[in-house]
């Protein structure tokens, strides 16, 4: 009798163990609910694995020691990296009862780091592009500026100054520009249309002055700003990288803004690769 009891007890233990291995006696509905629960856990854990990869990529861009056109992007990326690293998730144990499994799964479905990662990657990409754009306008070659200006609507001709033909006399001098490219525009009234582009100066359309450093460009821009609103006003002026973009005072305010934007967009267009053309080939060009 004792052996029979032991045999029955052993059989019960084995059966219980089998139940644990095969789902601890869960119904098909409970098994399906548990699978859905585990699926959500795996989804969230996969997002965190992707987070680690995205953070590593973002940190590489953040570590680039070059200026960006938008100086707000680097601190913005630092914030995104910090917030992404703070994302946490500890997988809970699956409940046993159907109602509890379903409720827990519903809570897991509310956890989604997709938008966090999208924002991290967006700011990372924006900073990367901004750095590359800034490189284009950091002491660019004269030929690059000329080629950019030639493709802009309402710019009819361009001419780069030389040391022999430089009205301001600042080419290659200490604190002066390394290149100055004037352009003429059909938007300006007739008196300037038949003039020598360089002699007409900024009044004939505008110009782009290139400096060695952003500080030198800003210093020049601040100087021009002292004449704004007066009889000696020379038109609009804006610094981008180490370039000073100027438009004629003979243009309307709207025309100045549109022209300035078009020039900056062209200079910072990543499709416009810097060229190694000889400066002698870009002294003067007129579109027909």
Walk through the language-model features, giving the residues of each:
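Second-shell loop/turn segments in exported
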Residues: 132-139, 205-210, 244-252
């Amino acid at each position: 009798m004792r052996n029979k009891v032991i045999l029955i007890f052993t059989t019960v233990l084995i059966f219980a163990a089998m139940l644990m291995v095969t789902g601890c006696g869960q119904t098909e509905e409970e098994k399906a609910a548990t699978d859905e629960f585990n699926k959500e856990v795996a989804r969230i854990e996969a997002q965190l694995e992707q987070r680690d990869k995205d953070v590593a990529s973002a940190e590489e861009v953040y570590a680039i020691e070059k200026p960006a056109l938008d100086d707000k992007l680097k601190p913005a990326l630092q914030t995104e990296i910090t917030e992404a690293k703070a994302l946490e998730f500890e997988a809970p144990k699956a409940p046993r009862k159907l109602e509890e499994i379903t409720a827990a799964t519903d809570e897991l479905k509310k956890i989604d780091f997709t938008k966090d990662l999208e924002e991290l990657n967006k700011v990372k990409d924006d900073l990367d592009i901004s750095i590359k754009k800034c490189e284009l306008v950091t002491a660019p070659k004269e030929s690059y500026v000329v080629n950019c200006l030639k493709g802009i609507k309402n710019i009819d001709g361009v001419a780069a100054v030389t040391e022999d033909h430089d009205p301001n006399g600042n080419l290659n001098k200490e604190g002066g520009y390394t290149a100055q490219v004037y352009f003429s525009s059909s938007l300006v009234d007739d008196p300037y249309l038949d003039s020598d582009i360089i002699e007409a100066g900024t009044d004939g359309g505008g110009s782009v002055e290139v400096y060695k450093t952003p500080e030198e460009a800003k210093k020049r821009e601040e100087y021009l700003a002292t004449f704004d609103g007066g009889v000696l006003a020379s038109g609009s002026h804006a610094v981008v990288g180490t370039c000073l973009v100027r438009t004629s005072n003979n243009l309307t305010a709207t025309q100045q803004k549109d022209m300035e934007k078009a020039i900056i967009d062209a200079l910072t267009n990543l499709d416009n690769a810097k060229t190694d053309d000889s400066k002698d080939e870009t002294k003067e060009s007129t579109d027909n």
